[in-house]
């Protein structure tokens, strides 16, 4: 039984982000649809060939998406919201873009569908919308066309489909409430049709993704898998594919299904290979997800070999990436600026394909010399001085419970803060960033490229900060910010100033649509060699008598939005960051900054997939925040900002952060999010966002007033702040001025109405 290699998917965007550039050019009306489609064809052909040359035996087809693979599945099934449909009922690429982003070169603009995180990754998918009695039919044949493309190029392929149960699980009901699981019988005929078309083309194996099988699903959803797969059986061999967690808790459901193989994530799950081998039907193929698809680290292939070798020859076996390589950058070879030693520790998507080929060859032959040679750098890393900092490890080990406790409870602190700041009722502020103009971006780029010296760069940044303070004073805001002109990204900026991080030059990964991010990589113990934000905060404060907030990104968010180390726990990384930023809080305070905001937008999205694992995560996540903040004196006010849509299930932890003020995103929910805080009797101060910064629309004074009055019905007015939903980085100055002026006016009106 020869072992084969395959990947669950490959990055779509292209080494130079060609897809992003083609999409944005098309959306702007600067190129034709045909030009966009040609870029897609060229990228697919290139990526198939690259994987093949790297040693992948079965190439994934159907992993490419023009925006998002869940949205592609919606179009495949004919699930197009009425507001996005073409008049003639047809479906084209502009239909897809209207659903994803609200507008396209053709058709009428309409509200985009909701977007949310793909399981516990930093990739986002477009949430399917379901309505009672809706019909499904095969309307978008992208998968079949791409299969034809790959076959014409002579490739051995494995089409990829998002499975029917997971697809329904990921969606939301719109309009009249009903159980969306009842739609299963309606979508299965479309899946049957697609599988029949694939069988006609001579396809042997189809990868059918059901990552919902790693979750703690309600029993009704678990029970739905058997009839669903009974309906899909018989046309091609099905590789039931799971990832991001283990399958053991749901294995009884899985082994009853009429499929021919199972893929398991052996990186992020705790499944035991011997137990899987024992419990799976003897004629099933096992696809072992041994290479991490979500990180940038070179694998220790000697460990992977030992993990799987015991079952070689005992059942059909493939070796694979743990999940799609979508979550990894494409090619390490173009990272010419990385330090040689550090570079030897990494593997990007193409290198991970090579790792699979090395592992396959060793498992088939029993010869392991190549594995030992490949693994030597990652083994040597364990003893590198770049990784271990004895002072950091000693400080972390010495943390006591006292380190995460403020000096006094909120009630005492609030008195000290009121006496210090003497803020009016309904105090107004913003979340942190102001518009990142072309001038600001140009200034940073020129400095980075060496076209501008440090003195001129600092003079330019200082001028933008000064203008931000002048604008805020003109508007009449009560608590000001410096505007973050010096920051490119809220995580990257801190990573650049902390030891223990490195940055790639071209390590882009897709976040959603055309948006790509370049996460920092945590390579070792984290420390702060010098103050990071103090200079600019102190300068901004010198320009005004009003308080200026110091602005920090919190430890859990920095962790969640970086590629983490694999040799220590996430808890260890978060607490190391917290200790480094604790020193920043102390230095800001010593510089006269009386209000310090520690943003934690990722606290909720970092939750483990299984609820039974939540408590442990929340315990150390909250502790990391508190270690970061607790050095502050009573009279220093600690703010935090979070942009979630759901608080109910983590309110205990939100309260346990013990921030003096929390600002949250509420405008789009019409203040309904405050129900969680009201029901919990949240004791500290809250700034419910009063307008949506993602929209260029300027809210009226009356609209903001109405929202604030609604908020005051749930939270005592003396504990309410007035602020936008989020930072204003992506907005232009004209709508920013107009919206903030109306916000300040609404607050003044409410003060006078008292």
From Swiss-Prot:
UniProt remark on cofactor binding: Binds 1 zinc ion per subunit.
Keyword check for Methyltransferase: yes
Residues the entry annotates as binding 5-methyltetrahydropteroyltri-L-glutamate: 17-20, 117, 515-516, 561, 605
Family: Belongs to the vitamin-B12 independent methionine synthase family.
Swiss-Prot/TrEMBL keywords: Amino-acid biosynthesis, Metal-binding, Methionine biosynthesis, Methyltransferase, Repeat, Transferase, Zinc
Metabolic or biological pathway, per its Swiss-Prot or TrEMBL entry: Amino-acid biosynthesis; L-methionine biosynthesis via de novo pathway; L-methionine from L-homocysteine (MetE route): step 1/1
Protein function: Catalyzes the transfer of a methyl group from 5-methyltetrahydrofolate to homocysteine resulting in methionine formation.
Gene name of the encoded protein: metE
Keyword Cell inner membrane carried by entry: no
Record-given protein name: 5-methyltetrahydropteroyltriglutamate--homocysteine methyltransferase
Alphabetized GO MF terms: 5-methyltetrahydropteroyltriglutamate-homocysteine S-methyltransferase activity; zinc ion binding
Reactions the enzyme catalyzes: 5-methyltetrahydropteroyltri-L-glutamate + L-homocysteine = tetrahydropteroyltri-L-glutamate + L-methionine
Superkingdom to which the source organism belongs: Bacteria
Pfam family, one: Meth_synt_1
Native organism: Salmonella gallinarum (strain 287/91 / NCTC 13346)
Residues annotated for L-homocysteine binding in this entry: 431-433, 484, 599
Binding site for Zn(2+): 641, 643, 665, 726
EC number, as in UniProt: 2.1.1.14
GO biological process, one term: methionine biosynthetic process
Active-site residues annotated for this sequence: 694 (proton donor)
Cofactor(s) in the UniProt record: Zn(2+)
Binding site for L-methionine: 431-433, 484, 599
